């Protein structure tokens, strides 16, 4: 692989602790058996909620399918003084100087077009796995031709879009190619308010979904999958209750491809419809939707990246050095408490073919187990 100018390339098989307070590891989480049966593994990976309402469910259709790809994973941790730690300091002695550790991993090497192909295949596979599990699956072409489905996607959010998590973590969310994303879990506050106003007029995406289910006499299925490349764990920013001092700041990272998600059913038998403002509205009774979700992510031990590079910028290093110096001087002077910043950035260089193959296999395994568990709940 070509080295980036000024960047340190880290071996994909041997990562060390590179920054004080930041431990990096490639230890492998337990992976599922891709060659084993879904039924025998489902209980180890999939949990069921409201599964009793699967009784009688046969004719189904996938009304939404969204795949979220992790592209940026971040976490932070910090040291902190406990309750009254400064008040108990003797006059004229050094004040406490704390540090905040910030670590970011960015995935590079796979573009949106490839992610879209993975999402398309995962959504097609969802229908296949439901059929293999014994459900009567209405083809997507039939659903797509329905005017309620078209109206639902006219109210959705354009795909792909960036979803921002905590501490700078970022994901790309993609639906089926050429279709929008209508699941409220992916819609931000502004769009959510917009949907609420539309609901008053009977035109929200969810209401179109309800009418579609009634029109085609099917149980709606909503599929959500997350493909992530890194799992970061922080030891936090303060001790429990804040009474004791916290003298460590650590972020642990596991670089491993994993899939998680859920498959939600909206049983037609639990749907209630009524008329409001001259329009029919339909919804599933509260707490009557069976959901089959991962309790443990499906992970693979197979390699999907070529290397990991330290891409901490000069600006990051200057900021870290400046805040550490300032914190030391402030503490020594006894004039103020201060927090230094320690910033580190890594780039995970993906192997497109490996990332593609492993992502598809993980998504397929998740869907097969969820469909199997759903079928056995009927």
Q: Model segments located where?
A:
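Bacterial N-terminal signal peptides that target proteins for export
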Residues: 2-11
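A structural "domain/chain start" motif
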Residues: 23-121, 125-138, 143-178, 183-256, ...
């Amino acid at each position: 692989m070509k080295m980036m100018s000024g960047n340190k390339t880290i071996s994909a098989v041997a990562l060390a602790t590179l920054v004080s307070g930041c431990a990096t590891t490639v230890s492998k989480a337990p992976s599922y058996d891709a060659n084993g049966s879904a039924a025998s593994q489902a209980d180890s990976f999939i949990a069921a909620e409201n599964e009793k309402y699967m009784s009688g469910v046969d004719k189904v259709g996938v009304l939404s399918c969204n795949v979220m790809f992790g592209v940026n994973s971040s976490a932070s941790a910090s040291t902190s003084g406990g309750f009254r730690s400064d008040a108990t300091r003797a006059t004229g002695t050094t004040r406490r100087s704390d540090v905040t550790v910030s670590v970011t991993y960015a995935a590079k090497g796979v573009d949106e077009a490839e992610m879209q192909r993975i999402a398309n295949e995962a959504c097609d596979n969802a229908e296949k796995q439901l059929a293999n599990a014994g459900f009567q699956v209405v083809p997507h072409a039939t659903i797509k031709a329905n005017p309620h489905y078209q109206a639902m996607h006219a109210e959705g959010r354009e795909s792909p879009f960036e979803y921002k998590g905590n501490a700078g973590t970022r994901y790309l969310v993609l639906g089926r190619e050429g279709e929008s994303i209508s699941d409220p879990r992916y819609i931000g506050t502004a769009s959510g308010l917009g949907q609420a106003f539309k609901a008053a007029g009977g035109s929200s995406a969810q209401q179109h979904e309800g009418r579609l289910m009634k029109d085609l006499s099917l149980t709606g299925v909503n599929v959500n999958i997350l493909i992530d490349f890194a799992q970061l764990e922080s030891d936090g920013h303060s001790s429990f209750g804040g009474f004791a001092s916290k003298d460590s700041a650590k972020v642990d990272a596991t670089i491993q491809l994993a899939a998680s998600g859920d498959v939600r059913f909206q049983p037609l038998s639990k749907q209630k419809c009524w008329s409001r403002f001259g329009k029919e509205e339909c919804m599933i009774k509260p707490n009557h939707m069976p959901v089959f979700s991962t309790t443990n992510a499906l992970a693979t031990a197979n390699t999907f990246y070529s290397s990991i590079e330290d891409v901490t910028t000069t600006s990051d290093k200057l900021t870290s050095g400046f805040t550490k110096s300032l914190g030391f001087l402030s503490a020594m002077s006894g004039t103020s408490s201060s927090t230094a910043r320690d910033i580190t950035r890594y780039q995970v260089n993906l192997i497109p073919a490996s990332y593609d193959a492993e992502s598809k296999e993980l998504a397929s395994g998740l869907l097969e187990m969820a469909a199997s568990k759903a079928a056995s709940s009927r």
